[in-house]
């Protein structure tokens, strides 16, 4: 098990050695709390866009299903006649310049895996830049938009926001509820009291403090041919290699097991860079990966490589609440 995997395991399952990291946690908390205090006091340069900005983020390290929910929000807003744009940090991307407009024909190394996935799926105008304020300004200069979604950026306080949504993995929760490096939190748990809504990925019902949403498998898609098959394409009991380079790979493997397949799990680091050699496994079996991984593997994919497309399905109560917010934010 890699060091990062051991650390994640300790954060969520507990380990006495984490007590040694608490002095560093104290330093980290002072930095992030000071940063937020300066924002609340109006210090520094804060950019407020001429259109509403909705931040979709988390306070934990690891995946929470953010990208599928953003895709749902894009389509939901479009159905209500809103022109939507997205900004993202573009983690791992190496574009020729910044800010950078992501196009569907770009590579994941140029655009970043998650931004490229969003553009390929939705065709939405999307700009990447670690400076999200600059990304928003560039996007608005290029496109007439009614609304901006910020993919993550909860801690990017230089960008003013009109709505903050925080996603939490319902199964893992907040781990030991401690900040980095003694726990998985980017900000103290008290920060959740100031956001507009919590969404629990994998919850089967709304909770007192937040809404439920599920990730529903929608199709198997062949990396090479683009062939689309229903999720029952493989028979029950089918053995296959399962590849996941996401924040919480086990959630993907559990999904495959829920489809009654027998996955041979191959977990990689989040935003991993792949090669054909790295994904050549024995015995020879069909390979199924996440859609986020697929955008990095099409160029060297074998004939029997597939990705599982998933769609976010939020609760009815969240849909109603979100519609109310859109009406409130509309001019």
Curated annotation (Swiss-Prot):
It comes from the Bacteria. Pathway: Glycolipid biosynthesis; lipid IV(A) biosynthesis; lipid IV(A) from (3R)-3-hydroxytetradecanoyl-[acyl-carrier-protein] and UDP-N-acetyl-alpha-D-glucosamine: step 6/6. Keywords: ATP-binding, Kinase, Lipid A biosynthesis, Lipid biosynthesis, Lipid metabolism, Nucleotide-binding, Transferase. The keyword NAD does not apply. Signal peptide: none annotated. Its EC number is 2.7.1.130. ATP binds at residues 60-67. It catalyses: a lipid A disaccharide + ATP = a lipid IVA + ADP + H(+). GO terms for molecular function: ATP binding; tetraacyldisaccharide 4'-kinase activity. GO terms for biological process: lipid A biosynthetic process; lipopolysaccharide core region biosynthetic process. The keyword Transport does not apply. One of its GO terms (cellular component) is plasma membrane. SUPFAM superfamilies: P-loop containing nucleoside triphosphate hydrolases. It holds the Pfam family LpxK. Belongs to the LpxK family. NCBIfam families: lpxK. Transfers the gamma-phosphate of ATP to the 4'-position of a tetraacyldisaccharide 1-phosphate intermediate (termed DS-1-P) to form tetraacyldisaccharide 1,4'-bis-phosphate (lipid IVA). This is Tetraacyldisaccharide 4'-kinase. It comes from Pseudomonas savastanoi pv. phaseolicola (strain 1448A / Race 6) (Pseudomonas syringae pv. phaseolicola (strain 1448A / Race 6)).
